[in-house]
Design a protein with these regions (language model features):
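Sec-dependent bacterial lipoprotein signal peptides
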Residues: 1-19
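Low-complexity, repetitive regions of proteins mediating host interaction that are extracellular
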Residues: 2-5, 38-42, 200
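Acidic/polar, low-complexity intrinsically disordered N-terminal segments immediately downstream
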Residues: 18-110, 206
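Hydrophobic beta-strand segments within beta-rich accessory/binding domains
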Residues: 78-93, 140, 144-157
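Exposed low-complexity, polar/acidic, P/S/T/G-rich flexible segments that act as propeptides
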Residues: 103-108, 159-173
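Tryptophan-paired
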Residues: 110-143
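Short, solvent-exposed aromatic-acidic interface loops
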Residues: 156, 179-194
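Short, low-complexity, Pro/Ser/Thr/Gly-rich segments in the mature regions of secreted, periplasmic
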Residues: 192-206
Length: 206
């Protein structure tokens, strides 16, 4: 009888030790512990000098200044634009001005943030300057960090004509090297035709 009593007591103790706790814990407010801070915007580093593409066929009226405001570590740059077109006859000689057929355009953003057109043909009413056949044109101006070093080259010409342009920037502090934008296009098809590689791109100066 005593053995049965001890076995019964042992079973009661064992069951009590294995029973789960029924204590209720306070529900955590995870919104308070981990508040949503919104989607983090990607950080853009203009030090990377990413070449951003534009539309070489867009009209001047569609232009929107693509520069940005940079307020720290602002640098000043000396920009240089050089461009030249050439139209030759079957002997390789420059075509006289009165017989020129090329209609090339070079566009850049000037220091006043306006899109400026340079043209090979004097009938282009949008042009601020005109190119002379076979002679390079060189322009210089200053700009600061956040300015778009911009170059557009497009147009049509007869076989054997060509258009080339380069824009570059050198920082006055001497420490920042900006890769230039360069175009060199030749029209080699019969008759009048568009250049094969119209170009429009810019780099935000870091």
């Amino acid at each position: 009888m005593n053995v049965m009593k001890y076995m019964l007591v042992a079973m009661v103790v064992l069951l009590a030790s294995c029973s789960r706790s029924t204590t209720d814990y306070a529900e955590e407010d995870y919104d308070l512990l981990f508040p949503f801070a919104g989607i983090e915007k990607p950080k853009v580093s203009y030090e990377d000098q990413i070449v951003q593409q534009g539309n070489p066929d867009a009209p001047v009226s569609d232009f929107v200044y693509p520069g940005v405001e940079i307020n720290t570590n602002v640098r000043t740059y000396n920009l240089t634009l050089t461009c030249q077109f050439r139209e030759v006859d079957i002997l390789g000689n420059n075509v006289p001005d009165d017989d020129l057929a090329s209609r090339f355009v070079v566009r850049y953003v000037a220091a006043n943030r306006q899109l400026i057109t340079i043209a090979s043909n004097t009938t282009n009413e949008e042009a601020a300057q005109y190119l002379t056949n076979g002679k390079p044109l060189e322009l210089h101006f200053k700009a600061q960090s956040g300015f778009p070093m911009y170059l557009l080259v497009n147009g049509v010409g007869p076989r054997g004509s060509s258009i080339k342009a380069t824009i570059s920037a050198v920082s006055e502090d001497g420490f920042t090297i900006v890769k230039p934008l360069t175009v060199n296009e030749h029209q080699n098809e019969e008759g009048m035709d568009k250049i094969k590689g119209p170009f429009c791109a810019y780099i935000i100066l870091p």
